Amino acid sequence: MSGPRAGFYRQELNKTVWEVPQRLQGLRPVGSGAYGSVCSAYDARLRQKVAVKKLSRPFQSLIHARRTYRELRLLKHLKHENVIGLLDVFTPATSIEDFSEVYLVTTLMGADLNNIVKCQALSDEHVQFLVYQLLRGLKYIHSAGIIHRDLKPSNVAVNEDCELRILDFGLARQADEEMTGYVATRWYRAPEIMLNWMHYNQTVDIWSVGCIMAELLQGKALFPGNDYIDQLKRIMEVVGTPSPEVLAKISSEHARTYIQSLPPMPQKDLSSVFHGANPLAIDLLGRMLVLDSDQRVSAAEALAHAYFSQYHDPDDEPEAEPYDESVEAKERTLEEWKELTYQEVLSFKPLEPSQLPGTHEIEQ
């Protein structure tokens, strides 16, 4: 094995060799998942702490290669205060022949909503501010034509100033079969996506926001199902069994037959579920946790709800340029995905330190 690329150094972390530019110092592992492992580091060029994600086996298979390309393109496209932003992307490779590793550099966020819920009881003001930011980021993502599909507390990062960013969006499309075994994911998933009821739309993410908001208010998960059947039962105990109109929209005959076999359950009054909660919070939850996805509020509508009157500013809730999915919808070979990804890595222009939000011109 030859030495590291000029200007790079190697370090073994969690049984993985990392090869990174010398400006990234003090690498410390902070977590790992199915798609890669993450370290915190100090970026000497940006003069700030960052998160560095090393994608695991980015080109191991066609599915991996396509997902790698999609993740990089999504991160490059989305630029919003409440969505994780790409500060840099690099590879130790100097040619397409050697290209096998991809590293993504993003803003370092101290905690996620999972940590927050476990550590402290949140005031209603806290919940307002967090859910407002979550919906503000979601409005932006949805305006690009992207569906997150996997919103859950661990995918929502928060820093010490209570500023929130959405992580890991849009990746679950090809990865569904890998995620079915992962329990906590299911608790936040809209019934129509979990049970393949029908073609779903962006409001699957609104259901997830409802589940997250409920957890922030209660300090515990709203629908912690043990399996799909238990999950559905818990959901219907709160929102009631679907009306004939909703049943008619379910394209899966199997799902329809099963639901019709259940004893009818009425919709619960949410104020009996969330004792002492702000009535406006309960009203908003009632508009998000709706079985009929056509009746759920959109992110833009939810932002205008009276619960957020303290924060809502229609002139400061931006939308995105539409995201062109046609490139990744095409069938390509593994080598073609790799070549496209390599071009995306090379064409990325990192921000100068002076362009970062909240930073000033730094004298060199």
Swiss-Prot record:
Residues 312-331 are annotated as: Disordered. The modification Phosphotyrosine is found at Y182, Y323. GO terms for molecular function: ATP binding; MAP kinase activity; protein serine kinase activity; protein serine/threonine kinase activity. It is found in: Cytoplasm; Nucleus. Its cofactor is Mg(2+). Dually phosphorylated on Thr-180 and Tyr-182 by MAP2K3/MKK3, MAP2K4/MKK4 and MAP2K6/MKK6, which activates the enzyme. Residues 314-326 have a biased composition (Acidic residues). It catalyses: L-seryl-[protein] + ATP = O-phospho-L-seryl-[protein] + ADP + H(+); L-threonyl-[protein] + ATP = O-phospho-L-threonyl-[protein] + ADP + H(+). The modification Phosphothreonine is found at T180. Activated by phosphorylation on threonine and tyrosine by MAP2K3/MKK3, MAP2K4/MKK4 and MAP2K6/MKK6. MAP2K3/MKK3 and MAP2K6/MKK6 are both essential for the activation of MAPK11 induced by environmental stress. HDAC3 interacts directly and selectively with MAPK11 to repress ATF2 transcriptional activity, and regulate TNF gene expression in LPS-stimulated cells. Inhibited by SB203580 and pyridinyl-imidazole related compounds. The active site is at D168 (proton acceptor). Keywords: ATP-binding, Cytoplasm, Kinase, Nucleotide-binding, Nucleus, Phosphoprotein, Serine/threonine-protein kinase, Stress response, Transcription, Transcription regulation, Transferase. GO terms for cellular component: cytosol; nucleoplasm. Its EC number is 2.7.11.24. Its main location: cytoplasm. Pfam families: Pkinase (PF00069). Residues 24-308 form the Protein kinase domain. ATP binds at V30, G31, S32, G33, A34, Y35, G36, S37, V38, K53. A motif (TXY) lies at residues 180-182. Gene3D superfamilies: Phosphorylase Kinase, domain 1, Transferase(Phosphotransferase) domain 1. Interacts with HDAC3 and DUSP16. Belongs to the protein kinase superfamily. CMGC Ser/Thr protein kinase family. MAP kinase subfamily. Serine/threonine kinase which acts as an essential component of the MAP kinase signal transduction pathway. MAPK11 is one of the four p38 MAPKs which play an important role in the cascades of cellular responses evoked by extracellular stimuli such as pro-inflammatory cytokines or physical stress leading to direct activation of transcription factors. Accordingly, p38 MAPKs phosphorylate a broad range of proteins and it has been estimated that they may have approximately 200 to 300 substrates each. MAPK11 functions are mostly redundant with those of MAPK14. This is Mitogen-activated protein kinase 11. It comes from Mus musculus (Mouse). The gene is Mapk11.
